[in-house]
Amino acid sequence: MADGEDIQPLVCDNGTGMVKAGFAGDDAPRAVFPSIVGRPRHTGVMVGMGQKDAYVGDEAQSKRGILTLKYPIEHGIVNNWDDMEKIWHHTFYNELRVAPEEHPILLTEAPLNPKANREKMTQIMFETFNAPAMYVAIQAVLSLYASGRTTGIVLDSGDGVTHTVPIYEGYALPHAILRLDLAGRDLTDCLMKILTERGYSFTTTAEREIVRDIKEKLAYIALDYEQELETAKSSSSVEKSYELPDGQVITIGAERFRCPEVLFQPSLIGMEAPGIHETTYNSIMKCDVDIRKDLYGNIVLSGGTTMFPGIADRMSKEITALAPSSMKIKVVAPPERKYSVWIGGSILASLSTFQQMWISKGEYDESGPSIVHRKCF
């Protein structure tokens, strides 16, 4: 390897549902695997099978039938540090096959992440993994970078949490950031419930993954929900079939758009919250009147839960209805938006101007974990 190459920074975007990890400068993450740690439900009886006390990611996924699955990140925020450490260990050693002590590491965090969380992340990187340098960046800001903008409002919706983050000339405006605890996992739960009402039983953590797959493959967002419901009642044009792992085939119709409609109408699952369109609008309205025009014209979608077909048109329609009538509204849905946080991180970590931003091991040893608040905005 060339001299310059072995110090390629690592970029690790830890989401509630998936970990996206790889090398700065690459155009896509090398490793994408579920943020799951699984522990055996039964004690092993076969000797020499090399059973482990914990499985991470895809391996946990494939053995899900015999494991209890745990998600160390909930609503975008880490709540189980031991498991999180296992995930990071797996990321560096098994997925990327690198020695973390040789690479600067860029991590991502949810907007409005508690301060203590940020410090704990920093501490683990330096003390457990001996990183030479690290940095923590806000996810939505990275998505905006990836779209080639410095001003706009990002609607970032993943598996565990949705945020609207207005950014002006590269600065996130914290007073106007809004968080909505409604995201992909809730939609999966909602679909599980709808399917259960129809007589299919999906209950275990393993079966939830099947429902997630159905959602990702078949769900879409209706431009006009009521109209679509009428269509679904009167014709079979929206029906699609899906084959379960055991060969059973199920047909889903109106569920295809009933499930993601929750993003616009959280009341459908009994949540007292504004929909994503209203949250975006409220977020814009919390900003200075002079910059609103720039935000309305740069609404950037990011995260896996914005991958539903039809979301950009519907978003555009709903925001047009809320905004002043002469306002030009543009909703941008980049095709790679599932990974745009990671891509933004890859761009940021490879900028020459960013190199002085890293927190070095030396600075950490001198100041302790609180250094992260001074160096990372």
UniProtKB/Swiss-Prot annotation:
It is found in: Cytoplasm, Cytoskeleton. It is an enzyme of class 3 (hydrolase). Its EC number is 3.6.4.-. Keywords: ATP-binding, Cytoplasm, Cytoskeleton, Hydrolase, Nucleotide-binding. PROSITE patterns: ACTINS_1 (PS00406), ACTINS_2 (PS00432), ACTINS_ACT_LIKE (PS01132). InterPro entries: Actin, Actin/actin-like_CS, Actin_CS, ATPase_NBD. GO terms for molecular function: ATP binding; hydrolase activity. One of its GO terms (cellular component) is cytoplasm. It catalyses: ATP + H2O = ADP + phosphate + H(+). It comes from the Eukaryota. Actins are highly conserved proteins that are involved in various types of cell motility and are ubiquitously expressed in all eukaryotic cells. Essential component of cell cytoskeleton; plays an important role in cytoplasmic streaming, cell shape determination, cell division, organelle movement and extension growth. There are at least eight actin genes in rice. Belongs to the actin family. This is Actin-3. It comes from Oryza sativa subsp. indica (Rice).
